[in-house]
Every structure is written in structure tokens, then in C-alpha cells.
Amino acid sequence: MTKKLSLELRQTRKPIQTACGFCHEKHLQCDVGRPCQNCRKRNIASFCRDKVKRRRKRKRSDASNFDKDEAATQTLNFNTVNPGEGSSSAMTQDEKNTGTTTATTTRTTTNFRSESKASSSTENISRAMKDPADTIIANSLLDKPTIGDTDDTGWGFGSIWTNDEYMTLNDLTSFASESMPNQLGPIEEQRSPRRTLGEPLARRYDSSQPFQYLNFGSKLHKTDSRPYISLEQPGNVPSIPAFTMNKGSNDEDASPQQKESQQMQLWQQQASQLQQQASQLQQQASQLQQQRTQQNEPVSEWTPFQLRLLIKTPKDLFDKKNLVKPHNYRKAYKDLLECLHKMFLGSYYRRQNGRWRPVSDDEDQMRRRLMRKEQLQHIAKSIGELYMPKFVALTSNMIEEDLLLQELVLQRSLLELENMSKLVNCTPICIWRRSGEICFVSNEFCSLTGFYKREILDQRRFIVEFMDHQSVVSYYDLFHEHLAFGPKDSTRTILNKDQAVYTECNLLLNNGSYLKCACCLTARRDAFNISLLLMGQFLPIFDVQ
């Protein structure tokens, strides 16, 4: 710490013109000697140098100074030429020529500076418009207006530099909006007038334009925090106009104006088709809502496809929560048993005179029929012994409001999982209830299996319908042991703690064959530790031969 000086020493010391670099940085009193005493005491005498001062930047008030010089010159000339004041001698011819030359030079210099400034600004703006992406370089090239360079136009902002930057961005984005029309909304040509130097700023720039550079093309629709985006199914992709399919030498010979007009027509047709499809879906949703409301049918009886037409966001769910009723799991399990019976024994039995009879008495058929019957009994036994007792114990004290809350939580979780599936859109995903009813399939799952999304979601379908017999047996063993109510042994594996199980299964394809896949099963539970939703992520396994 620097030692404080006495009052006498401070009074005798006088400031010097230039201090050394060390004393200047440490705010010490330096002396005129080099090296100074402070540097000698610290053994840094070899580094003692005068502090190099920065040159002061001149204020750019040349225009006002030129105006003052011009006014002073004109006043001097007027006072010299006027013969009615005093007895001073007349100006000589050389002095007149000199005064005239000075005034002319001043005016010429002022005009030249203003013209060069306007031309450089125009060149920079045009250069930036040619390359809309390089906006930062374009903004840095613009000349900053001087302090005294003002006109009689009204500025939209308090800062002239900010104003100039916003106007440049507006010009760039207006140019970009003409070259990149928006395909999400109606195609409209937005031709914004170019900024001219002679046009008053108040007229060409209003209070709503500073943020106009954020809009490219037509205005985008405001999306929710979880927008429901449904990709087109196979076979429902809008058709491409015929003239785009017949591209030949005519396109090469066409002028840029013709190509632009053809592209605009293509965009307009695609936009109109998308609008028609959106309006049709909206009409279907409104008609469906009216019919269901008149019939007082709860949301739980709707198919997942119909439900998603009505409820697309969490806000829609809570706005229409009066339509949500507890799910009828009794009917769901009844349909599941019928589905399993048809899947395992449907091809081996037929109904005759109200009774089920074997289709064939062949030994091979009998052996297969017996194996399928044992597999079905194993599934029923695991449901009765591992699942039903715990489920009854956990739900015995639940009231109707608890079931309603459970369904609301399920629908809200389903929206969240659907949103998550759009972030990992490279993995085929299927989501179903604990009863096996499918609630959601991703587009990748449809591409993997070959089924249409509406074919799966527009009716009650179970996940077991898309597996082979052995995969169904393995699924129920894993579900009852690890996923239904959590693992029996909490210290088993980390995967079980994360409520996820990895296994293999065979997925049914649209052509009737099966594809071997690696499967990750994840359970989403409620406050009663009951699984609400199960999500399966499937990746195909290709055997290397």
C-alpha cells in the first residue's frame, strides 16, 4: 500500500507533464528523472518509460465549422466592400479575388463532403441488399451521422445511430421477404418501398416499423408452447402440379420473370391445398364435437384420432375438461381378452352351434394349438396373480374424483410425451395405456411397420396386435414384474430405478411378416404408483449374414 505523504511534502511537490507507465498505472507521484525514484526503489528502472498518451479524437463538427467560416468570410467581404462606413480605404483587387476564392472553396468543400457521404451511404446499403445474410458487415460499413449534421425531418428514435441501423435492417429484410416468400401462410407479394435519401424520415418510418425486420414474408401464426403438428400420412401428400413434372428445355429458355411466376403459382397451389386440408380437419373436429356433445358421450369413449382433433394443446384440455370422464378400463380389459383369444386361438378354433370347435385334428395343428393355449393361460395367470391383487389394493380407496384426476393427468402426460417424440423424431415410438390400448404412434413407427396412422388411432387397437405370440408373453412378464408397479427389488439395476426395461420383440409389418427390433419400455406413473402410460421405442435389428 502506498505511504501517505505529509502535508508539507504534498504542497512542495508539483505535478509533472508526463509520468512513466508504472506510476501512471499505480497512480503514484512521478518525477522528471528517468528512471524515476519509484521505479528505482522497485528495481524496475530498466522499464521506466514515459506514458504514451492517446491522441484525442476530433469531434466531427466540420460542417458547422465550415458554415461558421463561410458566414465569417461573407461578413468580412460585406464589411470590406460597403463604402458607407468610415473613411477606410477600399479593398484592392487582389484582396477581392482572395475573398471570393475562399468563399467558393468553402461552399465547394461542403457540397463535396455531403455528396460523398450520401453516395457512400447509398453504395453501402445497395451492397448490403445484394447480400442479405451479411447484415453485420453492412451495418459496420454505414457512415455514422455527425453531431452537427441534422435536418428538419423528425427522427423516430432518440438515437440517430439506432435509427440508421433499424432502417438498414428494414431494407435488408424487406428485400429478403421478396426473395423468400413464406409457404406456411397465404402467399402474398409484399413489396415495401425502398428507402430514399431525399424522402422525409417521418413519412417512411413509423412507430410500428422498428421490429418489422423480424417478419419474413407473411405473418406466421402464433404457436403454443406445445403445438400439435401432424405430418402427412402416406397417400395423403398434396400432389405436385403437372407443369412442375414436365421440366425440359423450356425451363432453360424461360426468362427469370417467367420462372418466378411459375414458382409463385406452385407456392400458391400448395398453400391453397394445405388450407383446404386444414379447413376440412377443422370442420371434422367441430362436427365431431357437436355430435359428441349432443350425445353426451365422454372423451374416454372417443378414439385417439378423434380426441386429438379436439384437444391439441394443454389449454384445450383444461378448457374442455368438463368432457373428460374416467376411462372405462373394464370394457378395455374385456376387449383385450377377446383380442388375445382371437390372436392365439382364432386360427385353430371356429364357432359352430354356439360352441368353439377345433378347425383340424391334425397332429401338428393340435401341438401348435396346445402351445398357444398354454401361452394364453400363462398370460391370464400372470394377470390374475401378479397384477390384479396389487391393483385392487391400490385402487380400493379411490373415489370417482380420483379417477377423473387420473384421466386428466394421463391426457396431460400424453401431450407432453407427444411433444417429446417430436424432439427425438428419428426413433419409432408408440404410446399405450396400461390396458394395452394404443394412444399415439409416431410417423417413424408408421414408416417402420407400414401401417397408416389413422388406421391405428381411429379405432381401439392394442399393442399386442403388433407383436408375435412369444413377444406378447415376454411383454406381460416384464410388465407385471417391473413396469406395472415398479420393480420388486429396488436394488436390482439402474434401469429399473429409471422405470425402463430393455428387451427384444418382433413387430408385425403391414405385409404380414415380422421384424426383429430392440425395444425400450418406459412407464409413466401417477401419485398412487399405478402406471398410466407406457412408451415403447423400437429400433430394427438386421441380422448380418
Curated annotation (Swiss-Prot):
Any one of the GO CC terms: nucleus
Listed SMART domains: GAL4
Ranges annotated as biased composition (Basic and acidic residues): 61-71
Function text: Transcription factor which regulates nonfermentable carbon utilization.
DNA-binding region coordinates: 20-48
Composition bias type Low complexity, residue spans: 98-110, 257-270
PROSITE patterns: ZN2_CY6_FUNGAL_1 (PS00463), ZN2_CY6_FUNGAL_2 (PS50048)
Region annotated Disordered, chain positions: 51-131, 228-270
Top-level taxonomy: Eukaryota, Fungi, Dikarya, Ascomycota, Saccharomycotina
GO molecular function: DNA-binding transcription factor activity, RNA polymerase II-specific; RNA polymerase II transcription regulatory region sequence-specific DNA binding; zinc ion binding
Gene: GSM1
Family to which this protein belongs: Belongs to the ERT1/acuK family.
A GO BP entry: cellular response to starvation
Protein's cellular compartments: Nucleus
Feature: compositional bias, Basic residues: 51-60
Keyword set, alphabetical order: DNA-binding, Metal-binding, Nucleus, Transcription, Transcription regulation, Zinc
Pfam families, per the entry: PAS_13, Zn_clus
Top-level taxonomic group: Eukaryota
Name this polypeptide is given: Glucose starvation modulator protein 1
Residue spans of biased composition, Polar residues class: 72-92, 111-125
Residue span(s) of domain PAS: 416-486
Annotated source species: Zygosaccharomyces rouxii (strain ATCC 2623 / CBS 732 / NBRC 1130 / NCYC 568 / NRRL Y-229)
Principal location listed in the UniProt entry: nucleus
